[in-house]
């Protein structure tokens, strides 16, 4: 906890529901009052079947000037064409976010990742919101 930011119990609880019960497609976390990581948004929409649908939905729930952490459970096609669910941790640090906020999120990220267990890959996205979908899709398909 280098930054002094705590992780709420709800963050871990909701992550476990995503990982074990597959109740959520993704979770968006935010840092509240520079003190604690909390759940900002939970997505349970069963109509989001593909990783493309999930990425678009995530993008629609982000803001151009605010950092966020996202955990997404996405069905990714293997080279053999089989879908495998993978849990990604995404640190969203948009170009237009304030420097102080970027530093706080960057210094708190590892503590959150250590509190949860079962992440396939940890990613950092720093592009503009309009490029988020393409950037994330490219990274995911190349992992």
Swiss-Prot record:
InterPro entries per record: ADF-H, ADF-H/Gelsolin-like_dom_sf, ADF/Cofilin
Q: What Gene Ontology terms for biological process does this UniProt record contain?
A: actin cytoskeleton organization; actin filament depolymerization; actin polymerization or depolymerization; cytoplasmic actin-based contraction involved in cell motility
Q: Which UniProt keywords apply?
A: Actin-binding, Cytoplasm, Cytoskeleton
Identify the GO cellular component terms for this protein.
Answer: actin cytoskeleton; cytoplasm
**Is Cytoplasm given among the entry's keywords?**
yes
Q: Where in the cell is it found?
A: Cytoplasm; Cytoplasm, Cytoskeleton
Q: Does the keyword Mitochondrion apply?
A: no
* Gene3D superfamilies xrefs: Severin (3.40.20.10)
Q: Name one GO molecular function term.
A: actin filament binding
Residue ranges occupied by any ADF-H domain in the UniProt entry = 4-141
What the protein does comes down to:
Not involved in actin polymerisation, instead functions to stimulate nucleotide exchange on monomeric actin and influence turnover of the small amount of cytosolic actin microfilaments. Essential for erythrocytic schizogony.
Task: Describe, as the record does, how this protein assembles with itself and its partners.
Answer: Interacts with monomeric actin, does not bind to actin polymers.
- What family does this chain come from, according to its entry? Belongs to the actin-binding proteins ADF family.
Its name, as the record gives it, is Cofilin/actin-depolymerizing factor homolog 2
Recorded source organism is Plasmodium falciparum (isolate 3D7)
């Amino acid at each position: 906890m280098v930054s002094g930011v705590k992780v709420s119990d709800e963050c871990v609880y909701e992550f476990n529901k995503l990982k074990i019960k597959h109740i959520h497609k993704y979770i968006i976390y935010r840092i509240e009052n520079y003190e604690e990581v909390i759940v900002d948004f939970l997505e349970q929409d069963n109509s989001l079947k593909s990783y493309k649908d999930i990425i678009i939905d995530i993008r629609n729930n982000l803001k151009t000037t605010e950092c966020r952490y996202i955990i997404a459970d996405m069905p990714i096609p293997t080279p053999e064409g089989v879908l495998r669910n993978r849990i990604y941790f995404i640190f969203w640090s948009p170009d237009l976010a304030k420097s102080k906020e970027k530093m706080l999120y960057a210094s708190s990220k590892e503590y959150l990742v250590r509190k949860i267990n079962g992440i396939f890959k940890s990613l950092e996205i720093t592009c503009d919101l309009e490029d988020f979908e393409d950037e994330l899709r490219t990274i995911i398909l190349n992992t």
